Amino acid sequence: MNPAEHDEAVSQFCAMTRARPDEAQEYLATNGWDLEAAVTEFFAEQDETAGSSEPTGQPSAKSSSSTPRESSSSRKQPPKKFATLGDLASGAADSSDDDDDENQDFFAGGEKSGLAVQNPDDLKKKIIEKARRTQLPASDDSEPRRNYFTGPARTLGGEDTPSRVIDTPSGPAQPQIPRRVRRTLHFWADGFSVDDGELYRSDDPQNAEILNSIRQGRAPLSIMNAQHGQDVDVEIKQHDEKYVRPKPKYQPFAGKGQRLGSPTPGIRAPAPSEPAPAPQSSSGPPKPNVDESQPVVTLQIRLGDGTRLTSRFNTTHTIGDVYDFVSAASPQSQARPWVLLTTFPSKELTDKAAVLGDLPEFKRGGVVVQKWQ
């Protein structure tokens, strides 16, 4: 390769790994200027560094913290602004020795067995410190391209060629990769919470294990609301005050509704055809006794189930006669309490002795509505 090709390979290596030019030249020279092999070796060494085990935290480990820890693969990376769970895991081993003399452990267990749990407040400080030293890498994940045209197809035919249907090609279903999600980790004076969730108190040793998992780059599925194998970006927010339960978010079109056309809710039933003023038949509802020689008014009655009835009454009939007619016409009215009322303005008709001709709403007929109680 000529010098121009070498410079091009170094530029591509730096763009893919964010390494310095001298590091890129070293990896490329080691792998015979094979760009793919050099990049593979670079990321493999980064994974080995991130997966290194943490010290046990014993007092004897304090002396070993003075020994050089930098290897040929742990090269200085450009400063970052945000942190992911993987970045927190890669920096966990580097800072554990420095904090051994400040760790305060909790102990949980019985008389003959116990478990040492690290202080949650100390874990919160470590997570925040590593988030300040790192940044979120540029996401290479792109949303899967949506196919808007699915299903069978049909070809256009002509005079000599008929149209034909092309079925959907059957192939192996591709596994769907869950999309990267973002969660907000809130640190409060008395614990921590995720997004708008409940408080995890600092004095609970079990919650310290959750923080330790986050510090090591593992997202607990129980509190992160994520799927197995799903990438999670964690944004850290620190609060000086104690936990305050967030107010519920306003959701429009939530709760119960009431259908239009009736002052009472109910299930709309198909409205039967209005009976014509004809002699009573055995199939229709019972009709009140009407004296044709006396003034007659027509009342439209809207039942609570949506059914509409029309009946003729004399002006000498009472509200009680209307109650009797509704009770006889609707079997459902005999099983639950109800009341009749007028419309616009709505007023309950509780005086069953009132005469229709004496009520201004019914002197010339009107509408009566049944309301369930």
From Swiss-Prot:
Residues 49-59 have a biased composition (Polar residues). Keywords: Ubl conjugation pathway. One of its GO terms (cellular component) is cytosol. One of its GO terms (biological process) is membrane fusion. It holds the Pfam family SEP. GO terms for molecular function: ubiquitin binding. Residues 39-179, 236-293 are annotated as: Disordered. Involved in CDC48-dependent protein degradation through the ubiquitin/proteasome pathway. This is UBX domain-containing protein 1. It comes from Emericella nidulans (strain FGSC A4 / ATCC 38163 / CBS 112.46 / NRRL 194 / M139). The lineage of its organism: Eukaryota, Fungi, Dikarya, Ascomycota, Pezizomycotina.
